[in-house]
Design a protein with these regions (language model features):
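Dinucleotide-binding Rossmann-like beta1-alpha1 core, especially the glycine-rich loop
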Residues: 33-34, 38-91
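Glycine-rich FAD pyrophosphate-binding loop
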Residues: 20-40
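Central helical "cap/lid" subdomain
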Residues: 36-37, 122-182
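Conserved flavin/dinucleotide-binding core of flavoenzymes
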Residues: 34, 184-250
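Helical element adjacent to the flavin cofactor pocket in flavoenzyme catalytic cores
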Residues: 84-134, 138-142
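A short, Lys/Arg-enriched amphipathic alpha-helix followed by its capping loop at the start of a domain
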Residues: 3, 15-24
Length: 250
């Protein structure tokens, strides 16, 4: 079995972990080896340890700025211009999470030596399918399939908290502000790192995918991760378990 993984961010490295644990040889390509997605601005955490030696933490979720008679996800959608099926639909009071950066560092230490430099373009698909039995892609979907309809919205982020708005004390919390008259919409303090995400005027740009209906046209090409599948609900840890599931059928 010859397998290639495109992208060495969190999703790609978790796919590599699943393959390595099952003694499947693989090649791992990335256009920027040893950078991955760990340096991206904004809120990041893992929902599952995927067998890594990580300590679970509880992150509490809060919503402020609600209008009477309106559901939070509706107000949030209008404020950001996102679809109604957004993060505030059935938002739990808390999540049990794991440190994203620690996980990435462990994975990079284990599998980083396998990463080879290669910038993928759509014309490479034919040669990849000739050389490999399976292609696992975690890179942005339109890079591999430009015909896919891949929309996104852009917001901004700044480090720190939204002064002078009062924030609950303590670590490991996420506060959503859905008041449409306030620029910031999410504040997070998770694992000691603070971010405030705003509609405009930030120091960093964050892209948020708008789900597509595109599916892989070839059963040998497996699309993993939020960006690889262009599905906001495809979280990083899903890449690990989806790879294991696929392996059971190969």
């Amino acid at each position: 079995m010859r397998v290639v993984i495109l992208g060495a961010g969190m999703a790609g490295l978790l796919a590599a972990k699943a393959l390595a644990e099952n003694n499947v040889e693989y090649t791992l390509f990335d256009k920027n080896p040893r950078e991955g997605a760990s340096n991206n601005p904004g809120l990041h955490y893992l929902h599952d340890s995927c067998g890594l030696p990580l300590e679970p933490k509880i992150v509490f979720n809060y919503i402020i700025g609600c209008k009477d008679g309106e559901l939070p996800h509706e107000q949030y959608s209008r404020k950001l211009g996102t679809p109604l099926n957004n993060s505030l639909v059935n938002l739990p009071a808390y999540n049990i999470v794991y440190n994203f950066q620690d996980a990435y560092d462990i994975l990079l230490h284990r599998y980083g030596k396998k990463v080879q430099h290669l910038k993928i373009v759509p014309s490479m698909m034919g040669s990849l399918l000739e050389r490999y039995d399976k292609v696992i892609s975690t890179i942005p979907l339109p890079v591999l399939f430009p015909e896919a309809k891949c929309e996104h919205i852009e917001v901004q982020a700044v480090k720190g908290r939204p002064f002078p708005t009062p924030i609950l004390p303590g670590d490991n919390q996420v506060v959503y502000n859905i008041d449409e008259n306030v620029n910031w919409y999410r504040y997070s303090r998770v694992f000691g790192v603070e971010w405030t995400e705003v509609k405009q005027g930030g120091d960093f740009t964050i892209k948020k995918v708008v789900d597509t209906n595109f599916h892989s046209p070839n059963d040998r090409v497996i699309l993993l991760g939020r960006w690889g599948s262009w599905n906001r609900k495809f979280l990083a840890h899903h890449s690990y378990y989806e790879t294991l599931r696929r392996l059971s059928k190969w």
